[in-house]
Amino acid sequence: MVEEDLNQIGGNSNYNGEGGDPESNTLNQPLVKANRTLSSTPLALVGAKVSHIESLDYEINENDLFKHDWRKRSKAQVLQYVFLKWTLACLVGLFTGLIATLINLAVENIAGYKLLAVGHFLTQERYVTGLMVLVGANLGLTLVASVLCVCFAPTAAGPGIPEIKAYLNGVDTPNMFGATTMIVKIVGSIGAVAAGLDLGKEGPLVHIGSCIASLLGQGGTDNHRIKWRWLRYFNNDRDRRDLITCGSAAGVCAAFRSPVGGVLFALEEVATWWRSALLWRTFFSTAVVVVVLREFIEICNSGKCGLFGKGGLIMFDVSHVTYTYHVTDIIPVMLIGVIGGILGSLYNHLLHKVLRLYNLINEKGKIHKVLLSLTVSLFTSVCLYGLPFLAKCKPCDPSIDEICPTNGRSGNFKQFHCPKGYYNDLATLLLTTNDDAVRNLFSSNTPNEFGMGSLWIFFVLYCILGLFTFGIATPSGLFLPIILMGAAYGRMLGAAMGSYTSIDQGLYAVLGAAALMAGSMRMTVSLCVIFLELTNNLLLLPITMIVLLIAKTVGDSFNPSIYDIILHLKGLPFLEANPEPWMRNLTVGELGDAKPPVVTLQGVEKVSNIVDVLKNTTHNAFPVLDEAEVPQVGLATGATELHGLILRAHLVKVLKKRWFLTEKRRTEEWEVREKFPWDELAEREDNFDDVAITSAEMEMYVDLHPLTNTTPYTVMENMSVAKALVLFRQVGLRHLLIVPKIQASGMCPVVGILTRQDLRAYNILQAFPLLEKSKGGKTH
């Protein structure tokens, strides 16, 4: 993931936000380390690439240009804006559904023909040839996926969900939603899943849906954007944030054919800000996805999609099965939840260590990333082909309606090397696609289909593969690997209960999968609805709710969710909803004192001063001050007035357009409107290197008043950091000004500026190491 850049970066913390000695606590440090200062240069892993991280501007910049544009908007323009939001939400659902269908078609056909070829050699008892075909095909598919991620789009590696979660929290993740990333994600997902790796396409589909939303919102790629006038309304971070939320919900819906589950996933897991209008649009996007998927299912059921049928869209329909359970079954159901919570937290802990180990390998260079992926693929292929030889052949049950044995790509009873009339239960689970393996485990009224020994082998194998496959340089999802592990242990528990319970083994498998997902991902409501829509059986609702609540509670007592752990490992500055208790013992004024002095500008500033500030600082916003001619109420005579806050990008725009004045004066409103259309200021343009200013221009002036946000959020210097963090996160700020409690003549009206990096727990602990030991320092 990280190459030589890591040697130049430093800091530490574990995934609970606790500081520690770098020598004795190296396993608990972020993969990308920050300098041991409060104002460190923000670096993080985006996908598998080290990137410079900035925050997004979710706050409305209320400068004079925005106010004028807002006042002059007609009803027709407002309707255009509303119509555009709903149209883009529809297009997000449409394209996500189409791409999900394409991925499923490709995976099912590629994997299907591969398994048919292997089965052909098995029937001829050419076992070595069958192994070579399986290994060769899987290595080739893995090579394609890995090379694309390593060489063309490192941000496409992994699930993408942690980066999306960070983006919706206010973190700008560079190159995360580009066209190249999306294409590599699509092709790489097809290759990795068709190669039989223990990966799912659910996480990548969430990322793909978000990429589609981002590209539609900005009118295309960075180099080929549509200059449509209507799209100017979407030229801001707030609307793009909402559209990407729709894209993430559409991705989950496309993965599980779960429209309500997709909306709830976006609400519960990825979105930081939510409101009713966004709820309606995300629901509309998922509804469009379902319509597209339903239409393609009808087409494919007629045999027009090659080997693709109902299988590719993960829909384990058990609506025709009537499950029965009684009060006495609550005890085994609770046991499933407890085991799921313990195993889920253990999986999170071990995966945390494996990702650190993989980081050491990936630091060595691109070739090592590809070799690691190929090694995992080789190990997986050998296990999938070789382990079924350890299982005993089982006789076919003549009372069942299904064909037994089968030699095709799917089916519940694979013959493998068994004689006629017998099947290999372990081959049924291993020599198939991951989707079909889940269907086989979820199958009902088949109490004797899988032996306990085969289930144990399958469970142990997929625990190992689930740990060592995630983290390689391919697109990957965590949903399906966890479902496979959970379904296996759930079915084993059902078989062990035997006649002591009335619950079907297939239902135990469903509950086991739900419990392990809740134990690892710590979601409840969205997972409950996803599993109900997945199985199409409302009878599962009561016991599914119990299992999810117990598993999440048990898991929370050990460690954070898997996505929170990955967020920390990547160094993404995600702000949690609940501040640390010790943050109430520190004021924002004390935090501001630990930073370098604040850099301010005058309302009418000299060009040379602006150039000097831009060259010598990396700040992205500067307070604009004015000498108060008429003292305001409560303002001391001769005190300086805070006019507002101006962004670095706007200063660069001023210099590039050379909007200079020969004399020091305030400009008229019409002068600014002629030079700066409001929608232009929404574009980020902070590259100052190519701006050439002459010596004569250096002596000119710039009136910053029209471009200044006159209503920035401010807090008193005696406010606690905990309270400031809650405000910063809930409002979606990029900068928060600290103002003094008492204004006096000659005193600067701004004590400091807080940014996202300043409010991160382990950054604060580097500057105030004794805070954690203070009263309330530990969470009880």
Swiss-Prot record:
Q: Pfam families recorded for this chain?
A: CBS, Voltage_CLC
Provide the alphabetized UniProt keywords: CBS domain, Chloride, Chloride channel, Ion channel, Ion transport, Membrane, Repeat, Transmembrane, Transmembrane helix, Transport, Voltage-gated channel
Describe, from its UniProt entry, the tissues in which this protein is expressed: Broadly expressed in the plant.
Q: Which residues form the signal peptide?
A: none
Q: How does it sit in the membrane?
A: Multi-pass membrane protein
Spans traversing the lipid bilayer: 87-107, 130-150, 177-197, 205-225, 247-267, 277-297, 327-347, 370-390, 452-472, 477-497, 509-529, 530-550, 735-755
- Decide whether keyword Kinase is in the record: no
> Region annotation Disordered: residue ranges?
1-28
Q: Please give the Gene Ontology molecular function terms for this protein.
A: nitrate:proton symporter activity; voltage-gated chloride channel activity
Q: Origin, by domain of life?
A: Eukaryota
Kindly state one GO CC term assigned in the UniProt record.
Answer: chloride channel complex
Q: Where in the cell is it found?
A: Membrane
Its family? Belongs to the chloride channel (TC 2.A.49) family.
Q: How does it assemble?
A: Homodimer. Interacts with PP2A5.
State the protein's purpose: Voltage-gated chloride channel.
Q: Which PANTHER family match?
A: CHLORIDE CHANNEL PROTEIN CLC FAMILY MEMBER, CHLORIDE CHANNEL PROTEIN CLC-B
- Kindly provide the name given to this protein in its UniProt entry: Chloride channel protein CLC-b
Q: What is the organism of origin for this protein?
A: Arabidopsis thaliana
Its taxonomic path starts at: Eukaryota, Viridiplantae, Streptophyta, Embryophyta, Tracheophyta
